[in-house]
């Protein structure tokens, strides 16, 4: 970016003006209005030319040096801004506010708006289906205050979070496009590594100033009513956001009306790894296809899609809210009521963001036309909602309301299909304002006046070739061929000489010209004034309109979930007090949609008698799908949705952990195994007896002995924590865990071989798998036949030279699947019975206790 300079004297007057403005925004690209172009100078020009793929040139000299520059036409601004914002750049728009005709020296200019990725509101610069968030942080490693603002909706929230781990998980959930941190924080903190991190002056986070600014914004005496009066760190962060928003928007922010206190205790917590692995709204490749939201989002409005995304990324533990949503979905399914509502909801559009632009006073004519259509659709929607008896839906209907006066005002004011901008007029209907109509009539009647004048002048002069016309440079004129110019009457005043013709003007035509051109500029000014007044009228009704938009978005989400329940065969889960997770015929909602063959549904049962399932079976057998579908079913239940299962009974969970698949973190300098162990450590430190834990192939990133040892110890620890755990592994040694851990059970995904080909059956059955089918999977993947044959030779030799694996009691039973013979990697470890025997305090035992212990030891053999 351009470095600030303090000495302007060597520069031309215009460049002095430029530098005075640029010094206030050294880190942002400045678009400097000059006539019909926005010009960009110096280092800004070099950067912009590269990013926008436009020509870099030079303009004259200033301070003895040529000025690098590039430029864009003013009417093409939005397209270039969209590209820069997507690249994470911020842009300062500097407009001419003085009159070039009357200015002495450079035309007066000032910064009118600042566009940053987190504060854009223009429709063209936003992703309509995703929140555009900006966040601010204050605190230290022990406690952080986090404030989050969506300027395009007015949603403003605060919370305080303990420790980096929880903070980074929350930032992963929110994914803000900008993150403001104090400039006096140490460098290279984890938060600063996020894209969009920006440092701000420490005084922007001053807590006392923040409290005053927030109270002034919300017109309250204090912040107690928002439940955040004691969150001093979060208040400091919120004050920084408010300052930043006002600085960039250069206007009041009436659509920011309240502050919401969010609490982690109210939600099901997912860390960053779990969120990525479950592919809630972004797949592992960074796209949106084949995600949970891509399957369950058929919302009619963009604002509802954004709300659904928030629900998916912030599942709740509030049973009252969840049951209200379930009741609403049942009601909407009854007699297929959602089918009547959805077409009407589609007419509403994205009024949430339209209202925000109205609050920011930058709403465009088409925004008002869409709001007019939405308000016009409300009465019919309200009539349909009167049939909905669910209490929560009745509340939404009451909040939605109707606005007949505003609908009538917009109907009278805005033409049916207005232009994109107010700049050139043509937005307001005839009859809306008499003075505007009179001014427009003068311009519109100019054509007839010229026809009449031409006829009169031909008759008066007898010159048949006389013409009356107009051009933008010279205005109105009477044109005569050169040969007839000498016959012009004495009141004809020569205006322009052309090849073969002369142009004149008369006092009458000059008077009309002054009136017509004045009327046009006055009409544009009058229409802009009326348009601004219309925005102010709408702003005075902003609070109830925003409440209505929020209610309509929720109604749209609930109607969508009802439609999905019907068409995806989803059923209502039942929350119970007893700690359990019981799923009958559960399915993976995304995989089911992409398969060309029927999905194989499976059961799952976890309760006080079984808290962990050791899952074995071949690769591609369905272990990961089985685990992920369990997590998605639990997550959907915790947003109030129906779930892909014949039935589901569960208690509230506090967290969902997934350790499924890993890759190198090259930027962070961490290997695959290091990433895997970091995720495992997070789970072991934070899982509780109310957590759902998915562990897939723990320990595979290191040597066999180390990996198996870590997997075994991690499984034991999770069993002791009593977390609901699905533990998939290829270490068959772990299938003996149920012998020493009574809350652990074995299940496996079955498969069979036919003509040396593997067939995956995808059924989950009790007990450990009978074999791994590793060579069959390798053959299926296309490994050369010669390699497969050689592998079979090695396998045979290994199996004959290795000790047979000790079979667990369940595996010895008749018809039970046999654990394959393979090296017992823990052959040198003491038997569980010997371990237990070594810990006994024999002198402290009674004879009866000794006999009971003897029986326990016998059962371990």
Swiss-Prot record:
Residues 808-820 have a biased composition (Low complexity). Signal peptide: none annotated. Gene3D superfamilies: 1.10.1420.10, 6.10.140.430, DNA repair protein MutS, domain I, MutS, connector domain, P-loop containing nucleotide triphosphate hydrolases. ATP binds at residues 617-624. The keyword rRNA-binding does not apply. SMART domains: MUTSac, MUTSd. GO terms for cellular component: cytosol. The keyword Nucleus does not apply. InterPro entries: DNA_mismatch_repair_MutS, DNA_mismatch_repair_MutS-lik_N, DNA_mismatch_repair_MutS/MSH, DNA_mismatch_repair_MutS_C, DNA_mismatch_repair_MutS_clamp, DNA_mismatch_repair_MutS_core, DNA_mismatch_repair_MutS_N, DNA_mismatch_repair_MutS_sf. Keywords: ATP-binding, DNA damage, DNA repair, DNA-binding, Nucleotide-binding. Residues 799-822 are annotated as: Disordered. One of its GO terms (biological process) is mismatch repair. One of its GO terms (molecular function) is mismatched DNA binding. NCBIfam families: mutS1, PRK05399.1. Belongs to the DNA mismatch repair MutS family. This protein is involved in the repair of mismatches in DNA. It is possible that it carries out the mismatch recognition step. This protein has a weak ATPase activity. HAMAP family: MutS. This is DNA mismatch repair protein MutS.
């Amino acid at each position: 970016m351009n470095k600030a300079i303090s000495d302007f004297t060597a520069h031309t007057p215009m460049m002095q003006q430029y530098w005075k403005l640029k010094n206030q925004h050294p880190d942002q690209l400045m678009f400097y209005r000059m006539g019909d172009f926005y010009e960009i100078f110096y280092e800004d020009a070099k950067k912009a030319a590269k990013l926008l793929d436009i020509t870099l040139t030079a303009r004259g000299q200033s301070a003895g040096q040529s000025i690098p520059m590039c430029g864009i036409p003013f009417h093409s601004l939005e397209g270039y801004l969209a590209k820069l914002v997507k690249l994470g750049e911020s842009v300062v728009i500097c407009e001419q506010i003085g009159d070039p005709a009357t200015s002495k020296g450079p035309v007066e200019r000032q910064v009118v708006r600042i566009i940053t990725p987190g504060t854009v509101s223009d429709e063209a610069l936003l992703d309509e289906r995703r929140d555009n968030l900006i966040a601010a942080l204050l605190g230290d490693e022990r406690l952080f205050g986090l404030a989050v603002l969506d300027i395009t909706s007015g949603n403003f929230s605060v919370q305080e979070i303990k420790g980096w781990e929880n903070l980074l998980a929350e930032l992963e959930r929110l994914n803000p496009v900008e993150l403001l941190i104090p400039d006096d924080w140490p460098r290279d903190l984890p938060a600063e590594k996020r894209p969009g991190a920006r440092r701000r002056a420490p005084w922007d986070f001053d807590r006392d100033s923040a409290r005053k600014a927030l109270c002034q914004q919300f017109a309250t005496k204090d912040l107690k009513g928002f439940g955040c009066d004691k969150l001093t760190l979060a208040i400091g962060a919120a004050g920084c956001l408010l300052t930043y928003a006002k600085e960039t928007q250069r206007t009041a922010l009436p659509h920011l009306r309240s502050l919401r206190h969010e609490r982690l205790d109210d939600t099901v917590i997912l860390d960053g790894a779990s969120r990525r692995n479950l592919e809630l709204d972004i797949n592992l490749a960074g796209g949106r296809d084949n995600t949970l939201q891509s399957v369950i989002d058929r919302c009619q409005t963009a604002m509802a899609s954004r709300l659904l995304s928030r629900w998916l990324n912030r599942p709740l533990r509030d049973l009252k809210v969840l049951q209200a949503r379930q009741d609403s979905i049942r009601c909407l399914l009854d007699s297929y009521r959602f089918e009547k509502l959805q077409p009407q909801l589609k007419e509403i559009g994205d009024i949430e963001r339209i209202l925000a632009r109205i609050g920011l006073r930058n709403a465009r004519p088409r925004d008002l036309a869409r709001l007019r259509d939405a308000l016009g659709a409300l009465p019919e929607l309200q009539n349909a909602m009167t049939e909905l008896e669910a209490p929560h839906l009745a509340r939404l209907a009451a909040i939605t309301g109707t606005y007949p006066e505003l609908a009538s005002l917009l109907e009278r004011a805005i033409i049916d299909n207005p232009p994109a901008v107010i700049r050139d007029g043509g937005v307001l209907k005839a009859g809306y304002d008499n003075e505007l109509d009179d001014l427009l009539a003068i311009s519109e009647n100019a054509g007839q006046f010229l026809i009449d004048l031409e006829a009169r002048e031909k008759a008066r002069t007898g010159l048949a070739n006389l013409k009356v016309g107009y051009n933008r440079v010279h205005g109105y004129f009477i044109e005569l061929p050169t040969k007839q110019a000498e016959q012009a009457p004495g009141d004809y005043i020569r205006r322009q000489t052309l090849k073969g013709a002369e142009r004149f003007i008369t006092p009458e035509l000059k008077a009309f010209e002054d009136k017509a051109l004045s009327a046009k500029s006055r009409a544009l000014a009058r229409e802009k004034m009326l348009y601004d007044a219309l925005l102010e009228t709408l702003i005075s009704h902003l609070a109830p309109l925003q409440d209505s938009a929020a209610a309509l978005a929720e109604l749209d989400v609930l109607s969508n979930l009802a439609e999905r329940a019907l068409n995806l065969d989803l059923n209502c889960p039942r929350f119970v007090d007893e700690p359990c997770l019981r799923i009958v015929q559960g399915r993976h909602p995304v995989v089911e949609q992409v398969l060309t063959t029927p999905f194989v549904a499976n059961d799952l049962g976890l309760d006080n008698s079984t808290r962990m399932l050791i899952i074995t079976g071949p690769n591609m057998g369905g272990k990961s799908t089985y685990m992920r579908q369990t997590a998605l079913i639990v997550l959907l239940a915790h947003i109030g949705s129906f779930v892909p299962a014949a039935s589901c009974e569960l208690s509230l969970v506090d967290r969902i952990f997934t350790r499924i698949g890993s890759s190198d973190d090259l930027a962070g300098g961490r290997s695959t195994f290091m990433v895997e162990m970091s995720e495992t450590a997070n789970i072991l430190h934070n899982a509780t007896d109310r957590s759902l834990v998915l562990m897939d192939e723990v320990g595979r990133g290191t040597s066999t002995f180390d990996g198996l040892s870590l997997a075994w110890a991690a499984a034991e620890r999770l069993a002791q924590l009593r977390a609901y755990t699905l533990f998939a592994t290829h270490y068959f040694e772990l299938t003996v865990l149920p012998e020493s851990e009574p809350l652990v059970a074995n299940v496996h995904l079955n498969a069979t071989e036919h003509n040396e080909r593997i067939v995956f059956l995808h059924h989950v059955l009790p007990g450990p798998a009978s074999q791994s089918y590793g060579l069959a999977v390798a053959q299926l993947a296309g490994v050369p036949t010669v390699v497969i044959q050689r592998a079979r030779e090695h396998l045979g030799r290994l199996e004959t030279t290795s000790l047979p694996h000790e079979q667990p009691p369940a595996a010895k039973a008749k018809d039970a699947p046999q654990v394959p013979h393979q090296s017992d990697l823990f052959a040198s470890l003491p038997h569980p019975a010997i371990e237990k025997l070594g810990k006994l305090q024999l002198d402290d035992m009674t004879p009866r206790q000794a006999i009971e212990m003897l029986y326990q030891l016998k059962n371990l053999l």
